[in-house]
């Protein structure tokens, strides 16, 4: 970001207005420089070095940083009659402390080493280029003002923890702390000749930049330099928010929580199992995403003649203190049964949930289908439902609740599949996966809803477990590519009926496929974004989605449990 001349002048003004900050100036080090020059037989040129401190009183009488010729001359260590200047405040040469003349190798190029840059350009040109472009390229050559000595600069290093920035600082401590009697004995010495006394003088120099340059945040007004750095950091974090929404996820993706993630991506290997985690999170995306379209209406009526039920039924609204023994004692009159508590994904699904947190529902699994028929005959039900779906209720008791009415939801096996056109060939490439289905939604109703929204539905199926009871997902096949892509693009659909309101999730139906990139490895990961829309192996996924515009893509994986259950 390039700053205008007015902004740069304002920045320099703010810097020099802070009298208490240790400034990079010879004004407070004039005596030291005179002694250094005397030791070096007056070989240094201090013709343009400022020696007079700038106080607030003088500065207030200097509009637009203009000084008279006499004032400028009075600030020189060795004033000359030929000296001319139009500015009272120090320029880039003044900020260099006259260290250009000391032949400090690498002073004007703190990002380089002595060995790599033997033939350097003039320090004046380098410092001027940094000051004219104070942000420059933060990833490349940092400005001179961002290279403080410890401890004043320690907080800034914490704000920029990237290794390349940390390593790019000019390490002056070996030079300033050296006490070798012969500079040639030290590999870090930047002087061609010197002594202990000269090293002591150099060590006492105040070369830390003003504090306004060190502070990147605060309650006061931000100067142009702070605004520039802040905007750069905002842009980088905005890019991170597209991948990882929270600081926790960002720290997992880029170890060390680097401000610039690209460096860590190149240096640290990506977690090989991050794709699986993202795919699992995507399966619950309907809970946190807004619906793109809504369907509302009445579900198709159901007319059953001698229906066949699944041996598994759902009990809703069970007493909070109910036990497995209480359930078995209540329902064993209809036949042998077992109890499945919520949390089927756990290691012990047949055990009640831990703690005193009631789930409110449970599954009963009978050994025989006729036991379900007997249970439904013992229930009270409402056959006058507008959609033809009878609601069954059974009264049961627990130790603390008497005559609690619980809802019994059976499943008719014929509701698992619906075919609109039996002669139509089903194309898996035009099939979508629908997740987060409501338990009262059968295949015919699902086909009707998606046909109203996108058209072209020829088949709908509800995924079931080993007991042929629905597991909350289904598949819908279209007869044309346009309807299929419309459904995939919709992603989230809200269904509103007189009985329930539910938001479902639509994804491409996944098959076993080879990687579409290398064609040699299995491709278990699918990218649903229209830019990709391909199957990937693990290596090809990382390679493809390391590009800047593709990092936000979410992977899909086929659910192994769904494959085994249906």
UniProtKB/Swiss-Prot annotation:
InterPro entries: CEBP1_N, CEBP_ZZ, CEBP_ZZ_sf, CPEB, CPEB1_RRM1, Nucleotide-bd_a/b_plait_sf, RBD_domain_sf, RRM_dom. Phosphorylated on serine/threonine residues by AURKA within positions 166 and 197. Phosphorylation and dephosphorylation on Thr-172 regulates cytoplasmic polyadenylation and translation of CPE-containing mRNAs. Phosphorylation on Thr-172 by AURKA and CAMK2A activates CPEB1. Phosphorylation on Thr-172 may be promoted by APLP1. Phosphorylation increases binding to RNA. The modification Phosphoserine is found at residue 43. Isoform 1 is expressed in immature oocytes, ovary, brain and heart. Isoform 2 is expressed in brain and heart. Isoform 3 and isoform 4 are expressed in brain. Expressed in breast tumors and several tumor cell lines. Residues 162-195 are annotated as: Disordered. Its main location: cytoplasm. Residues 330-566 are annotated as: Necessary for stress granule assembly and correct localization in dcp1 bodies. The record marks 411 as: Important for the positionning of RRM1 relative to RRM2. Sequence-specific RNA-binding protein that regulates mRNA cytoplasmic polyadenylation and translation initiation during oocyte maturation, early development and at postsynapse sites of neurons. Binds to the cytoplasmic polyadenylation element (CPE), an uridine-rich sequence element (consensus sequence 5'-UUUUUAU-3') within the mRNA 3'-UTR. RNA binding results in a clear conformational change analogous to the Venus fly trap mechanism. This is Cytoplasmic polyadenylation element-binding protein 1. It comes from Homo sapiens. The lineage of its organism: Eukaryota, Metazoa, Chordata, Craniata, Vertebrata.
